[in-house]
Amino acid sequence: MKKVLLATSALTLSAGFASADVSMSGTGGAGVFGAAGADLSVYSGVDLGFALSGASDNGMTFSASLDMGGGQTLDTGDFELDTQDMGTDDNVSVAIGVSGLTITLSQNGVDDLYDDDIAGDIGISGAMGDLTYSVVTGLEDADPTSLSIGYSAGAISGSVATSDEGDASTVTVTYAMGDITVSAESDTDRTGADTSSVTLTYAMADGMSVSLENSEDVNTVSVAYSSGAISVAVEADDATAETWEATMAYDLGGGATFNLGTNEAETTFAGVGFSF
């Protein structure tokens, strides 16, 4: 999972009919990592992103993005290391905005709207009032087609995403009541398996939040606390094969963070990550 934090230095270009901004951003880090009880080993890596955006004199907007990196970077959310390609990615993404529509072109580089396990070549997205919509497809018969619709008004929001690859779909509804948020989800995956879940989250004023999820009779409790530079999170469930994880992050300033984590599978990491 690549997580690139946007924005930093920018260079403004102009060429008669249009102006464009070119920016570079990135993440990276180094530390130690051990999966499933294995000995700790050193990791290091960097993931860089380059983006160009601008507008023509007739109001058409455009953007293009390019990603490159090397080594391995830490994914604290999934307790894993992500391998970064040496050199640039195969696909460059180009997006064009016309009359409220955004059209994205990237060969096998536009994520399917149900999940990002597969991809298409063409993405179209837009909004009508409180509704947002997106379509991802391709020109070849074998290319998947997916559709998503979202709605948000006041305290309530909802979304539907579907893909013809395996007839997968997911429906989510969320309602916020002050410090309490309730969400429900129904999902049919690409193999036809159905799951549903209900999640209740309470955000306290002192930097602590508590979340309880029930999914197919499995309860998951998550507690997160943040104070100043430090953030701590713990999650556990009561599944037949119980799982738990604990993470800590300390903001070192200047875009650097120290991360520490462990889980029931005896996967452990400690390292410094940075963004710019």
Language-model features and meaning:
Residues 1-276:
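Outer-membrane beta-barrel proteins
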